């Protein structure tokens, strides 16, 4: 009897123990499930995670905190800005270029011109290597480079020998002012550029010497507002008096004088004696505007190029290209210059209309072209991408600047 009662008590104890164990296991499973569901509630789906990782601004979660009022975890976060992808760099003209870029042949030519000093240059101004901001240099050019033409009141052009030959209308009243202007170089890199339409969309277009537009309109356009020519072309070009190329737009001829010579002294000894050809042209085309640039202007510009350049530059006048840029800066609010600074199409072919090869056409030999390009690159307000793709530099004109 006693043995039977003990057996029943033992069985009841086992039953209670098993029941307690089952209840504990069930409760633990419920807690685990609740925790799993809670974790899932705050888990970012993989698709959303990928979107967030690819966005410019990512949300980064830190340790969760408990709200004392409600037993709900609060996730604190802060924003992390992703690194901006760097802009692509373009290999374009370096505004700090020096003669170290020249090949041995051009370096020898430079030394020869320094020794020759044909124009008796004796520069006594500041520099070399004076640093200007873009704004200060623009003001410096405006205030010290006088773009003006020979007038009938200038001796000896006021004598009977010249009566009736010079244009009656003042140059500044004949041209401009314009908003957007284009200066189109004659560089071989303009070939296959497809820039013609863009160039023609400007209010005025300046071209140089005998650079044609016929058969090249797709690359260089067809509009010609001003044509700047050197005295060598006017004197030696046999077609000058007959070719219709030289009857379109306003013509300007320039001839270098001895360093800072006045008009009478220059007239006695011009670099090229173009005066008789000029008179012949005016007799044939009396209504064609044809101006003569005062000889002081190129040397006023040369002084500034030397002032800001780290090296001694050739003691020769600036190129027609640089003169044309300054002329248009006096007449226009904005000047777009094409292939003065070379693009990705850079070539040793000198002209888009001729097959003549020489690296001097890009780097300079007679003219201080390398340092002219340095100055234009410094003044450029466009992008390196524009230079690389289109050979296009954009400069502000002088008319609206405050100095």
Curated annotation (Swiss-Prot):
One GO cellular component term: Golgi trans cisterna
Result when mutating residue 367 to A: Loss of catalytic activity
Lumenal side: 27-403
EC annotation from Swiss-Prot or TrEMBL: 2.4.3.1
Residue positions binding substrate: 186, 209, 230, 319-321, 350-351, 362, 366, 373
Record region (Catalytic (soluble form)): 63-403
Keyword Cell membrane: no
Subcellular location field: Golgi apparatus, Golgi stack membrane; Secreted
Complex formation: Homodimer. Monomer in its soluble form.
Protein name: Beta-galactoside alpha-2,6-sialyltransferase 1
Organism whose genome encodes this protein: Rattus norvegicus (Rat)
GN (gene name): St6gal1
């Amino acid at each position: 009897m006693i043995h039977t009662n003990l057996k029943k008590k033992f069985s009841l104890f086992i039953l209670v123990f098993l029941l307690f164990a089952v209840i504990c296991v069930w409760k633990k499973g419920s807690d685990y499930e609740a925790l799993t569901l809670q974790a899932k509630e705050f888990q970012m789906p993989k698709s959303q995670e990928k979107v967030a990782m690819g966005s410019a601004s990512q949300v980064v979660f830190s340790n969760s905190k408990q709200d004392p009022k409600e037993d709900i975890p609060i996730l604190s976060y802060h924003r992390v800005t992703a690194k901006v992808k760097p802009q692509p760099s373009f290999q374009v003209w370096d505004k700090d270029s020096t003669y170290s870029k020249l090949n041995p042949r051009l370096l020898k030519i430079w030394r020869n011109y320094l020794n020759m000093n044909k124009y008796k240059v004796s520069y006594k101004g500041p520099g070399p290597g004076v640093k200007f901001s873009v704004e200060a240099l623009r003001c410096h050019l405006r205030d010290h480079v006088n773009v003006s033409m020979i007038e009938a009141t200038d001796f000896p052009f006021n004598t009977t020998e010249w009566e009736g030959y010079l244009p009656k209308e003042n140059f500044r009243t004949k041209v401009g002012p314009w908003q957007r202007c284009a200066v189109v170089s004659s560089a071989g890199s303009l070939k296959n550029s497809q820039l013609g339409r863009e160039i023609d969309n400007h209010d005025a277009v300046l071209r140089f010497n005998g650079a044609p537009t016929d058969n090249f309109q797709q690359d260089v356009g067809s509009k010609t507002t001003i044509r700047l020519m050197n005295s060598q072309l006017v004197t030696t070009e046999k077609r000058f008096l007959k070719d219709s190329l030289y009857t379109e737009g306003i013509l300007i001829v320039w001839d270098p004088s001895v360093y800072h010579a006045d008009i009478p002294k220059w007239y006695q000894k011009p670099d090229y004696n173009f005066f008789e050809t000029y008179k012949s042209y005016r007799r044939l085309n009396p209504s064609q505007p044809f101006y003569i640039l005062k000889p002081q202007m190129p040397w006023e510009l040369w002084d500034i190029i030397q002032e800001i350049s780290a090296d001694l530059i050739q003691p020769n006048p600036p190129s027609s290209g640089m003169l044309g840029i300054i002329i248009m800066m006096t007449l226009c609010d904005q000047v777009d210059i094409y292939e003065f600074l070379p693009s990705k199409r850079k070539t040793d072919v000198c002209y888009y209309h001729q097959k003549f090869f020489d690296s001097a056409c890009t780097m300079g030999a007679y003219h201080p072209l390398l340092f002219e390009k340095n100055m234009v690159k410094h003044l450029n307000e466009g992008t390196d991408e524009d230079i690389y793709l289109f050979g296009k530099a954009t400069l502000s004109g002088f008319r609206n600047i405050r100095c």
